[in-house]
Amino acid sequence: MNFRFQRLLASPSLIFFVALFLRLTFLFYEAHQVPATALATVPFQNEVGSVAAALAQGQGFCCVFHQPTGPTAWLAPVYPFFLAAIFKTFGSFTVVSFYAAALFNCVFSALVCWPLFHCALRIGNRTTAAAAGWLWAVFPSGVVIPFEWIWDSSLSALLAISLLWATFRLADDSRRRNFIFYGLFWGFCLLVNPALGSVLPFLLIWIYLRIGSSDRRRLAHIALVICLAILVCLPWTIRNAVQFHRFIPIRSDFPFELWMGNNPIYDPHSRQLNRITRYEEVHRYSQLGEIAFLEEKGTAAKEFIRQHPALTLQLAARRVVAIWMGTPAPWQDFQRADSNLARFILGWNVLTILGTAAGLACVFIVRRWFLLPVAAYPLVFPLVYYLTQVSLRLRHPCDPALALLMALAITWPWLRTAAHANAG
């Protein structure tokens, strides 16, 4: 009986359904507190909702700020098209569309349990896999974000950990067709969230080192993956070149994000008006057009960084704290918080940092071969956000990898014992 219970607890199917139940419970509880008119509009008052509405109305990939400002490359294409399909089916800016989008987010987030379970099983053992799955089932950001953000965050988390799982499987079965599927999958992932590409070189290096074949054959496989990923993205890149007469591989908004994190509002000695309003920026965007607007913001951001190197480093340090703690002043916010949920999330973030560090140490000591691909997620993926803007939403794609590392830290004694036994 005890053995059956243990097997049940280690079942990825059970973990998935519990994870889905928790996310749906949070979704419906929180949605019940919000007026229906707000649910129908507020979650979509962002760039994704604006472009999706334009697509659903047959206007094309445009109108990024709810105004007729013409074509845009501000966003990667997959999630706006996905949301547009929901709008087309259930109506633009309706309560039903909100629930449909949030429900899909919950499913995406719960599905993370499957590839996460198998990644942990590959590195550790079944106890590690079960621990990783259960950690993800209750992971605060995994429960909260599907409701809070109608964005690609939950889908990106699923794709990010699926890429790690696919990488591990490719090392075990290096047939040519698997590399073809892997390259195509990478192309799709980049069209969902280009930031995932930051870990691609490290995963490819690991595959090159792990597959057993000649150097020439290994290089051919890696080149095939890269070419196929580029091929998948190429139609969108061509579309951007036709519309904007610029080389924009997937999305264009990085200069604006860089400026948002590096501008005179952060300088206490600046004589400029220390505020940024959405109205003013949208008005400027409408005046200049997307490319000129982004060039202006990029130039301003670079000039600010050049003139304020010390302040830039200080801001980057604050963003490092913010992306891992959810706020640049975690202790003060913990004391001021009037919500037990907010305090719990801050406390969980501390445990996540400690567990991630301990997990990396565990991998280095006991499973060193897996260090490169696993460490790329917490160490490389967030780097771009240290320069721009940060939030737990932006870190979310690497959260499943953090759950994996936390599980490795928790099951460290068993893994170390097994390693010594194998060595003996």
Predicted regions and their residues:
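Hydrophobic, aromatic-rich transmembrane alpha-helices
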Residues: N2, W114-L116, L204-Y208, I323, ...
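Loop-to-helix entry region of an early transmembrane alpha helix in multi-pass inner-membrane enzymes
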Residues: F16, A73, P77-F81, G91-W114, ...
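Short helix- or helix-capping micro-motifs
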Residues: A19-L22, A129-S141, L158, W165, ...
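Extracytosolic helix-loop segments that constitute the early lumenal/periplasmic catalytic or substrate-binding loops
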Residues: L24, F28-A36, F44-P71, V78, ...
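Transmembrane-helix motifs of polytopic, lipid-linked glycan transferases
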Residues: A100-G124, I161-W165, L354-A358
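Membrane-interface transmembrane helices that cradle and orient dolichyl/undecaprenyl
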Residues: I123-T127, L155, L163-F181, F185, ...
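Membrane-interface alpha helices of multi-pass inner-membrane proteins
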Residues: A132, A166, N178-N193, L203-L204, ...
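Membrane-proximal stem/loop segments at transmembrane-domain junctions that anchor or position
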Residues: A241, F247-A322
